[in-house]
Amino acid sequence: MNYPHPIIAREGWPFIAIAAVIALLIHAVGGFGFAWPFWLLLVFVVQFFRDPQRPIPAQPNAVLCPADGRIVAVETAQDPYANREALKISVFMNVFNVHSQRSPVDGAISKVEYFPGAFLNAAIDKASTENERNAVVIQTASGKTVTAVQIAGLVARRILCYVRAGEPLSRGQRYGFIRFGSRVDVYLPLGSRAKVSIGEKVYASSTILAELEQ
């Protein structure tokens, strides 16, 4: 499947343009000696907004990672968005990770809920319940419920979500973006088998987070 998005995310184009104009102006006035920190900033902004295509595993019961980052939680927890006990797997994204979010499963969206909140360090546990967040609840064709929650972080102050309740989602489909360091929590039915461990580096779409019970 072709990835229908530019390799540099559209969300970053205004920031890249501003950084490029500033670097060019300072270079023109003061030369490279004054401008090099601004060129370095431009490189950072470009790499932050990269959005590469990723291979998508074919296993039908696989739950794919929704974001690049590092696993900070694998535990049984309450899923407040679907009112159930669930297997919770959390991915923390630092400022050097790709920050687009992609659907972990095929299914239909039953609910999208936004919650205002704080901007605590997204790596800590209470960020899941206290930070600004946006939950997307997905029902698979087999009746399983999968919840993916975008969570703002200490620096990230803007959650973008491009889907609505009632719409279909395909595994690996890009559905959102969080700027500048953040977290995604995934809640799965009890009985799902986690395929990752705390501290593991993971990649959106290509890493299998868990397998749903068949």
Swiss-Prot record:
It is a peripheral membrane protein. InterPro entries: PS_Dcarbxylase, PSD-A. The modification Pyruvic acid (Ser) is found at residue 182. The active site is at residue 182. Keywords: Cell membrane, Decarboxylase, Lipid biosynthesis, Lipid metabolism, Lyase, Membrane, Phospholipid biosynthesis, Phospholipid metabolism, Pyruvate, Zymogen. Its cofactor is pyruvate. Its EC number is 4.1.1.65. GO terms for biological process: phosphatidylethanolamine biosynthetic process. It holds the Pfam family PS_Dcarbxylase. Its main location: membrane. PANTHER family: ARCHAETIDYLSERINE DECARBOXYLASE PROENZYME-RELATED (PTHR35809:SF1). NCBIfam families: AS_decarb, PRK05305.1-2, PRK05305.1-5, PRK05305.2-5. Catalyzes the formation of phosphatidylethanolamine (PtdEtn) from phosphatidylserine (PtdSer). This is Phosphatidylserine decarboxylase proenzyme. It comes from Burkholderia lata (strain ATCC 17760 / DSM 23089 / LMG 22485 / NCIMB 9086 / R18194 / 383).
